[in-house]
From Swiss-Prot:
Encoding gene (name): rplD
GO molecular function: rRNA binding; structural constituent of ribosome
Keyword RNA-binding: yes
Record-given protein name: Large ribosomal subunit protein uL4
Keywords for this protein: Ribonucleoprotein, Ribosomal protein, RNA-binding, rRNA-binding
A Pfam cross-reference name: Ribosomal_L4
InterPro entries reported in the protein's UniProt record: Ribosomal_uL4, Ribosomal_uL4-like, Ribosomal_uL4_dom_sf
Amino acid sequence: MAKVEVCNMSGEKVSEIDLADEIFGVEVKGSVLHEVVVMQLANRRAGTVCVKNRSDVRGSTRKLYRQKGTGRARKGDIKSPVLRGGGVVFGPHPRDYSYKVPKKVRKAALKMALSSKLADNSLKVVDNMDLPEIKTKAFAEAMAAMGVDTALIVTTGEEKNLELSARNVKGVKVMPTAGLNVYDILKYGNLILAQGAIEAIEGRLL
């Protein structure tokens, strides 16, 4: 088991905690992380893009002029894709981009993402993240004391004061343990876990 320092919001060490090797000490495979991140991004796509084909464009279906004898190139109706304002050929239409990778792969990727943060010394554990009041300045000072600029902060539950204080700070995201995912772990430079969140993560992944 890896030992990690537990600090307070002032960056001072208060204790140590053991992290399970089955979650925070697994071999990191880039291909697995890539597979899950691509899935997450695909699932976030709205899929609402839509263009008009020649049957959707408003206009007459009358042939513009006769087929032969004019000396000009042959043309159909005004909605033809070769004309300005005509329909689009094989254009995008609303569709669902979401898909799933196996549950075991998603679970393994989450363990790998957590392990990568520990291996890079980018994982910090904080004993208590509860702020007495909503104050962005106080939050920014706490981040500076911990030596962190960008971070994903994972709380045990809803920390309203913390969420509102961090809302306007660039490069910081606060989320409860239930929302923990591979993409957000990898996106932010550091991972800050509430001490109570570790128990929830171990309960979810062990």
